């Protein structure tokens, strides 16, 4: 039979190893969380640099928000970056959704001045048909760059219709739903961007 002293020693050892194991788990978890946070931060910065000039990226102060608005295509929270120059908000970069693509939702990133002038647009993800609807990708065609320097007036702005419907947006051979869906999403997103001074009381 173990002595009382041995029992106490074993209990202390078990307690020590339990504490050590728990501390190790917490330590590793904290390191992992910090690594994940850093990776996400790098991903966000990479996204922004896809749609704004390098000079603007490095010279403007950036503030990050999560925002929800039906103009962004759904009821989920979306990434928003506001860029400031001399403490004045000048540019917004927003992730949004075109919910009505031919093969499902299309995720896009839009950068625009708060007055509604578009700086850049990129498609982040989609499920469109290869060789047809996937021309929305910058790696496949320059179609998405055509939005640069366009101005959005309001949701009724007819410039953002396809040319076959009287607008200025090029369609794809054999595909009209996809480009119109993206164009509509770009327009809605910029209308949201124009609302930002009211939303944030800038």
UniProtKB/Swiss-Prot annotation:
- Topological relation to the membrane, as annotated: Single-pass membrane protein
Q: Which cofactor does it need?
A: FMN
Q: Which domain of life is it from?
A: Bacteria
Any one GO CC term of this protein is: plasma membrane
Write one Gene Ontology MF term: electron transfer activity
Q: Where are the transmembrane segments?
A: 11-31
- Keyword terms: Cell inner membrane, Cell membrane, Electron transport, Flavoprotein, FMN, Membrane, Phosphoprotein, Translocase, Transmembrane, Transmembrane helix, Transport
UniProt-annotated location(s)? Cell inner membrane
Q: What class of enzyme is it?
A: translocase
Residues annotated with FMN phosphoryl threonine modification:
176
* Cystine pairings recorded for this chain: none
Give EC number(s), comma-separated.
7.-.-.-
Gene Ontology biological-process entries: electron transport chain
InterPro entries named among the record's database cross-references = FMN-bd, Ion_transpt_RnfG/RsxG
Query: How does this chain assemble?
Result: The complex is composed of six subunits: RnfA, RnfB, RnfC, RnfD, RnfE and RnfG.
Its job: Part of a membrane-bound complex that couples electron transfer with translocation of ions across the membrane.
The molecule here is called Ion-translocating oxidoreductase complex subunit G
Q: Which organism is it from?
A: Buchnera aphidicola subsp. Schizaphis graminum (strain Sg)
């Amino acid at each position: 039979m173990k002595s009382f002293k041995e029992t106490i020693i074993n209990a202390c050892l078990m307690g020590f190893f339990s504490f050590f194991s728990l501390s190790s788990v917490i330590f590793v978890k904290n390191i992992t969380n910090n690594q994940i946070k850093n990776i996400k931060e790098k991903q966000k910065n990479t996204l922004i640099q896809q749609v704004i000039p390098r000079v603007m990226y490095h010279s403007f102060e950036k503030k990050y928000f999560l925002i929800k608005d039906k103009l962004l295509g759904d009821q989920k929270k979306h990434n928003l970056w506001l860029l400031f120059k001399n403490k004045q908000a000048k540019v917004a970069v927003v992730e949004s959704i075109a919910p009505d693509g031919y093969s499902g939702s299309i995720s896009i990133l839009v950068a625009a001045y708060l007055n509604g002038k578009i700086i850049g647009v990129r498609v982040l993800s989609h499920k469109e048909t290869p060789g047809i609807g996937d021309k929305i990708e910058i790696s496949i065609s320059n179609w998405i760059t055509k939005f640069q320097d366009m101005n959005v007036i309001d949701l009724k702005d007819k410039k953002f219709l396809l040319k076959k419907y009287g607008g200025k947006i090029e369609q794809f051979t054999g595909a009209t739903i996809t480009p119109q869906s993206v164009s509509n999403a770009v327009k809605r997103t910029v209308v949201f961007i124009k609302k930002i001074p009211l939303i944030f009381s800038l």
